[in-house]
Amino acid sequence: MSKLRKITSLIFLTIIMVGCSSIPEQPTSVEWQSHQNRLLQIENYQASGKLAYISPEQRQSLNFIWKHSPNQSQLRLTTFLGQTALNLTIDSLGAKVVTYDDQVFTHASASVLVEQLTGLQIPIDHLPQWFLGIPDQADSYQLNSTNTLESLSKQVSSQLWTLNFANYRNTEMQSKQLSDKDNVKVETIPLPTRLSFKQDENKINIVVSKWTLKK
């Protein structure tokens, strides 16, 4: 593991994310319970953008693609030169990482595996819900003025994580009407575009530049 971690560290770019281009945010006000029910209906989605990781030990700035479906999730981190820093797949059997030189590493917990290989502490097991703005089993959470999730706190493996959802954007979602299987209805739903995760001195800033989703 230590050898791979050293190799992985060389691939990571030590660039601090100073700022990101602004994204127009025009979220609509929602009724929270109804909104949460709609979020839970989203079975397949993809989010892509930029991720900045800051800790006392390292600072990284990376591109990310997060894909989620009922049977599998995938997180891919790449440098700004296009090099793959992490290619993680999660399914019912556990987590698997395939490295740039085709080495394969597995673990029951995705979060543990990523930390062992890269040193990054990321609560990956909760990302499928947190990315969408669902307070998955949160110890506490707060809503903002538009009744979407503003913040949450969650104890994960004896570590207290706090999340803030700074911005939302209305995102198109295709859904089939019950009366006609071939009739596809396009509706919109506000989804997070700026998120921050904090645990002790570790901080993760995420900017989602593109959402792709469907029920």
Swiss-Prot record:
Its main location: membrane. Keywords: Cell outer membrane, Chaperone, Lipoprotein, Membrane, Palmitate, Protein transport, Signal, Transport. GO terms for biological process: lipoprotein localization to outer membrane; protein transport. One of its GO terms (cellular component) is cell outer membrane. It is found in: Cell outer membrane. The keyword Repeat does not apply. This is Outer-membrane lipoprotein LolB. It comes from Vibrio atlanticus (strain LGP32). The lineage of its organism: Bacteria, Pseudomonadati, Pseudomonadota, Gammaproteobacteria, Vibrionales. The gene is lolB.
